[in-house]
Amino acid sequence: MTTKLYVDFGGYSAIEKGNLIIPRDNILNKEDFDSIEIGEVVDIYSKRGKFLGRGFKNPKEVRIMTLRKEDLDENYIREKIIKANEYRLKLGFKDTYRMVYTQSDWLNGLVIDKYNDIATVQIFNYGIEKMKDVVVETLLDLGIDSIYEKSSGRNRKRAGLPEVEGILAGEKTETIIQEGEAKFKVTFDGQKTGFFLDQRENRLELEKFIKEGDRVLDICCYTGGFSVHAAIRGAEVVGVDLSKKALKLAEENMELNNIPKDRYEFIEGNAFKVMEEFIEDGEKFDVVILDPPAFAQSKKALKSAIKGYHMLNRFGAKLADRLLVTCSCSQPLEPDAFKALVIDACLKAKKWAKIIKYGSQSPDHPITSKGTEYLKCLFLSVEEI
């Protein structure tokens, strides 16, 4: 018989708003929660006995998989993966896209990215971990040739699972993907794995603002996503990143797109230090792109993260002559707060900023609740005050 867990008003309210991760703190009968095995199916009820959802117990939380009383078995996993894939195909995605985006696709704690015939898998739900073989079998049935697992980081630890990186099926470890007119080499080797698919729409949008001969600074450029799109439109690009391996791949991506070597330069270094040096040297760029890693993965880290974002954007605004493209993938930082801090940072840099466009994550990362929206991307016109 499935264990019944009752939640307080905070837990009830969270589920009503579409948040399907319920911390142990919101569970009233904690003794029952503690007594069952990790990975077991549990039913969530309100204090008054209203059924709210069904999911898997994890060490510190329950990850709700469904709001119905249905079996969370192998067929459930298989059907939801197939349905999630069909949804992307209906949206027009073909070869490269996020196939499964955790709770948005009723597979809470599972992320699958597809790169042609290679898929990467991330699992941070103990219940899904127990059915990993089904995930692999389903992907193979859908025509995937090779599967690479990259289950690591904070969410993996919360699930009480060891970090795992390696091939689950097949032998391929690299492929070439197409994004608009741009091509990118994507590798799967345990260090810099995959490609940030969530920025697809924003990278394509960037091309509309680039003019022939523009000087572009791409901060935290990774493997050159924004850089390549800018270069394709005739820009001269300077990319900055801490990872030597990522920058090597960025250079390969420039070569792959037949960009002359005198039109790009990649600098290995700390973004803040490099930008400070550029400011001291009086450097200016027509376009500055800021796409840093998440500064805050929890609300506790938000205060220091805001300071970091403010400094980064202040430096970026000082260096930008015409356009500032700035991003944040910190989920706890809300869109309005991000807009406000960017505008303030521009003012502190003596720049008058006008928001041209606000972008979010690509639609293959569907937003179904506040908790599933994380990416923010602002396009701003900037001019001297």
Swiss-Prot record:
What's an example GO BP annotation here?
rRNA processing
Q: State the coiled-coil residue ranges.
A: none
* Places the protein is found: Cytoplasm
Enzyme class (EC, first level)? transferase
Tell me where in this chain the PUA domain is found.
2-81
By its UniProt entry, which PROSITE patterns does this protein fall under?
PUA (PS50890)
Q: Name one Pfam family in it.
A: Methyltrans_SAM
Alphabetically sorted, this entry's keywords are: Cytoplasm, Methyltransferase, RNA-binding, rRNA processing, S-adenosyl-L-methionine, Transferase
Enzyme Commission number, as recorded: 2.1.1.-
Q: Name one GO molecular function term.
A: methyltransferase activity
Where is it found, in Gene Ontology cellular component terms? cytoplasm
List the InterPro entries hit by this protein, alphabetically. Answer: PUA, PUA-like_sf, PUA_sf, RlmI-like_PUA, SAM-dep_methyl-trfase, SAM-dependent_MTases_sf
Concerning its family, UniProt says: Belongs to the methyltransferase superfamily. RlmI family.
- What is the official name of this protein in its record? Putative ribosomal RNA large subunit methyltransferase MJ1653
Q: What is the lineage of its organism?
A: Archaea, Methanobacteriati, Methanobacteriota, Methanomada group, Methanococci
